[in-house]
């Protein structure tokens, strides 16, 4: 009788152990396993911030010690979620081995003069101000999710105008032109005038149903031009982050999330505008004695994105 009771107790203990192990495994995976919603390859150089937490895998089971503020290569980004917490991780390579680190723990090296100017200034940006107008038609995006899949960049093409004058003109002529964008950006403002939950009508029928769009008035000093570009990069990063999208340049097959109006004309059609190519290149050459292209802008967007 006593032997049977001891056997039953052992069985109970074994069952308790098994149940505990299962619960522990479920708890561990819910708290430490990261689900990757998207990833994309890059070729960047960065510096580890002081106190950066470096891991040997995305599951973050084991911390790794690397020299502080060491230079590393960034070869991939991962958009992850764990326990309802969304974070972006960078896969870095140091001495031939890959590690993982939160993007807030690295600082990208900027090759372009304008990007470097902004980086050394701490990546400044204006706050987003909303003055949503009710006059613009609200139509949903044509994506399966109902959300935008990227951002299209415009410049106004007009000299010596301001955000206020451009917005006034767009509103006054909307009934006849049926053209509008979501947001206007200059060196001091990020002014959102149309709800980004709905499509804009500024880049032709092949782009409008898919992208958030913004316009940039022209700036004429080095500081104001750089700050406008910085605000534009911040806003682009904000929209992409808000919609859980990667930072990738638009491609001929329609992929990618960061587009100029000129790229829409070349790759998607339905429009023939070439902005902001000339505005960027002319201003960069005149004000900074350098060049500025969509590749430089994507690099800057990633820097702002990494801080979010």
Predicted feature locations:
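Short coil-to-beta-strand
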Residues: 205-214
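Second-shell loop/turn segments in exported
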Residues: 139, 180, 215-227, 284-285
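Basic/polar, cationic surfaces and motifs that engage anionic cell-wall
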Residues: 114-119, 145, 226-308
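N-terminal catalytic cores of peptidoglycan-degrading enzymes
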Residues: 2-36, 92, 97, 103-205
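Beta-loop motif signature
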Residues: 27-89, 93
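Acidic glycine-/aspartate-rich tracts in secreted/extracellular proteins
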Residues: 157-160, 219, 263-266
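Solvent-exposed, acidic/flexible segments
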Residues: 85, 146, 160, 176, ...
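Residues that flank catalytic or metal-binding motifs in active/ligand-binding sites
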Residues: 50, 68, 88, 97, ...
């Amino acid at each position: 009788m006593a032997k049977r009771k001891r056997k039953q107790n052992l069985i109970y203990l074994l069952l308790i152990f098994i149940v505990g192990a299962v619960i522990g495994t479920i708890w561990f995976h819910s708290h430490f396993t990261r689900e990757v919603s998207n990833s994309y390859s890059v070729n960047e150089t960065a510096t580890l911030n002081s106190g950066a937490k470096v891991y040997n895998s995305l599951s973050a089971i084991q911390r790794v010690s690397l020299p502080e503020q060491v230079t590393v290569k960034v070869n991939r980004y991962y958009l992850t979620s764990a326990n309802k917490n969304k974070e972006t991780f960078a896969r870095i390579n140091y001495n031939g081995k890959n590690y993982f680190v939160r993007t807030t723990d690295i600082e990208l090296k900027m090759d372009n003069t304008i990007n470097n100017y902004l980086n050394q200034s701490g990546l400044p940006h204006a706050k987003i101000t909303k003055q949503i107008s009710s006059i613009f038609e609200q139509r949903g995006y044509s994506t399966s999710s109902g959300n935008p899949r990227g951002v299209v960049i415009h410049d106004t093409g007009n000299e010596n105008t301001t955000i206020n004058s451009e917005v006034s003109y767009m509103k006054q002529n909307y009934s006849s032109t049926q053209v509008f964008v979501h947001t206007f950006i200059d060196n001091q403002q990020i002014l959102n005038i149309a709800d980004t939950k709905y499509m804009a009508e500024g880049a032709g029928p092949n782009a409008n149903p898919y992208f958030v769009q913004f316009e940039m008035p022209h700036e004429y000093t080095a500081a104001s031009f750089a700050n406008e570009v910085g605000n534009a990069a911040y806003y682009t990063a904000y929209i992409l982050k808000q919609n859980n999208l990667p930072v990738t340049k638009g491609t001929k097959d329609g992929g990618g999330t960061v587009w100029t109006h000129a790229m829409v004309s070349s790759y998607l059609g339905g429009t023939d505008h070439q902005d902001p190519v000339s505005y960027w290149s002319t201003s960069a050459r005149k004000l900074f004695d350098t060049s500025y292209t969509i590749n430089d802008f994507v690099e800057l967007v990633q820097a702002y994105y990494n801080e979010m």
